[in-house]
Structures are given as C-alpha cells and as structure tokens.
C-alpha cells in the first residue's frame, strides 16, 4: 500500500496535489489492481468527505495529481482543465536527442481501435487539435531529458507527440516505444509541476521531485 499521505505536495481547505507514484492507476482497472480510488479515505486530513480526483495521469506516469476537497471546488477545477486554464509541465526521458533545443509540436491526434490490437492514439489530420511546447533540459548517453508543456490535454498526447512529432519515443513506453529494455522499470514520464490560478487566493501549485528512476539514468 503506498503511503500517499506522505506524498502530499500542496494542501488547503479547497484542494490538494499529491505526487502519484508510477504504477498506481488513478481509477479502477480491469486487471483488479488497486487504484488511487482505494486510498482516498487516507487523504481526508480531518475532513469527513473524501477528496475527489479532478484529472487523470496514465498508470505509469508519476507526479502532480490534483484532488478537490469539496464538490463545488471539483466543478471549478474540472472547468479550469476543460478550458485550458491549468499550467502543466511534464518531464520525460527520450530515446535520443532532438535536433533543436526547443520547439512546438502541432499535431492532431485521433483514437483508433481494432479487435486484434485494441485502441491507441495516432497522429491524423482528422483528429483533435493537440499542441505541445518542449525544450531540452539535459543530455546523457544518447538520451535527453525534455520538458513538455501541453496547451491541450488529449489522451496520450505527450507520448504520441514525442514518438511521432519528434521521432523519439519516451523511454519505457510500452505502446509507442521502439524497443523494450529489461533494465527500464517504468515509462519515464513525470508530471513535474501544476499550477491553477484562483481569485483572491494564492494559486494551487506544486512541483514533484524527480523520481529515482530518472536519476538512475543519469538525470
């Protein structure tokens, strides 16, 4: 059982941000694994009502995850996400180094599915608008640590934009990666920071420290 109460990065009467560990699903999954939903009772901190999940991170993605502490705030925060009012920054280790130091990926994304392979996201002009700003933070042994700041919030956006837009998949990505490495324990995608402005109050904001899996690869 992950001790999530010790992974709180921000908390006040309205919201909290936790550092979600990689491998923990946000909501229930078909394989029966425990998810964040199973641990919400441990995050009440004196409130009778459990906090509610405002947005999702992929199971293998770690880092900043926002929870609301009352229904009214949940509606406001959900609206902020849907209207693109949330500042998000993700850090990822890529299989290679981009030719430029920074740039913008403007690549529409479409969800496709088949009985044999299931569903996945692909770059397609018929898809929904998806825009990501990126910049290189560090390089090491043929790989790069890249900061991604998405303008939009499409499913698997950063994973597909890295693999297709930059031609460099995220290390450890089981769906969009080019090869498997037995020495890689997880997908190297981390929700580094999150910020939401509030009227007449300080912003809801936090930064999640770089996981050990990243530092083990020299970053």
From Swiss-Prot:
Keyword Isomerase in annotation: yes
Q: Which reaction does it catalyse?
A: a uridine in RNA = a pseudouridine in RNA
Task: Quote the catalytic residue positions.
Answer: 58
Which keywords belong to this entry?
Isomerase
Specify the superkingdom: Bacteria
Q: Which GO terms describe its biological process?
A: enzyme-directed rRNA pseudouridine synthesis
Disulfide partners: none
Pfam families per UniProt: PseudoU_synth_2
The record's listing under InterPro entries reads: PsdUridine_synth_cat_dom_sf, PsdUridine_synth_RluA-like_CS, PsdUridine_synth_RsuA/RluA, RluA_PseudoU_synthase
What GO molecular function annotations does the UniProt record carry, in alphabetical order?
A: catalytic activity, acting on RNA; pseudouridine synthase activity; RNA binding
User: EC number(s) in its UniProt entry?
Assistant: 5.4.99.-
What family is this protein classified in? Belongs to the pseudouridine synthase RluA family.
Name it: Uncharacterized RNA pseudouridine synthase ZMO0505
